[in-house]
Amino acid sequence: SPLLWAKVKRGLSAGRVQSVALRIIADREEEINAFIPEEYWTLDAKIKVEGERKPLLAKFYGTDGKKIVIHSKEELEQIMKAVEDVPYYVDDIKKGERTKKAPLPFTTSTLQQEASKVLNFATQKTMRIAQQLYEGIDIKGNGTVGVITYLRTDSTRISEEADANAREYISQNYGESYVSAVAKKADDGKKIQDAHEAIRPTDVTRTPAAVKEFLSRDQFRLYQLVWKRFIASRMQPARYETTSVKIAAGQYRFTVAASKIVFEGFRSVYTEAGETKEENNVLLKGLDMDSVLTKESLNSKQHFTQPPAHYTEATLVKTLEELGIGRPSTYAPTISTIIARRYV
């Protein structure tokens, strides 16, 4: 702006969203610069279970009723001395179940975040490619076809027709047991622009594989992300069996936890960024309260607490949305301007 050029430096820019975004980034940098690392140690025990070939790796927990953080090497050495030559035995076994719900279909903001994390797309690139997919792709025999719905939306609402089509597709291709019991909604109580529904494929039968030959590599990757997320949003939760074991060593306790997926649900189609498709599926089935345990070794490692992470495009978009600053459609140009002007 001319005023900013006159008062500070020519070529600078400011704006309601841009200025707040820069303040958020600057505050985070101050936090990082002021951060003082704190030392702590972890301790693992490799434990042989009689009758089992593979040893367990148990993590130090603390005492029977209290979790302990090991702050120094001196504390570590005292604990290691106390657990070196004592009997190890199973103190407690807890079995249970947990579920993980399917994600909601994409809004503009969540698409930008996930594309940044999964595809390493800048927000501006995500919006540019989404615009291409919305405006239309030349598909042989069909002409120019828009393959996704409008890309600027705050809503996770899905039309009844699209919801029914997705459920029918899931039932036919995965089985009725994979179809979600109820439509997923998360708009209640939020200020949203609901003129447009969530970002979704315009036709669920137009699978990524079916249109791949008509798309560029980046168009295909983004379309596949949108298609999978939408289908997953209409599917049942994933279900897991869990086992948690507490192992006693004198006054101290070590823990081992494992989970096994027993019903894939939506994860047969989609896993979010940061997830692993296969979790630890060893259910510790050979372990019971009478199992004979032998400690094979103790392994310790020094760590230091880490400062808050620098903002990425994905985390900055998430923060702006959570604070209610700007609209998702403004995030891409705002972040592009911040980067282009080398403010960060």
Residue ranges and their predicted role:
Residues 27-30, 263, 302, 336:
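Generic secondary-structure boundary signal with a strong preference for alpha-helix termini
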Residues 1-97, 200-253, 260:
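Phosphate-backbone binding and catalysis cores of DNA-processing enzymes
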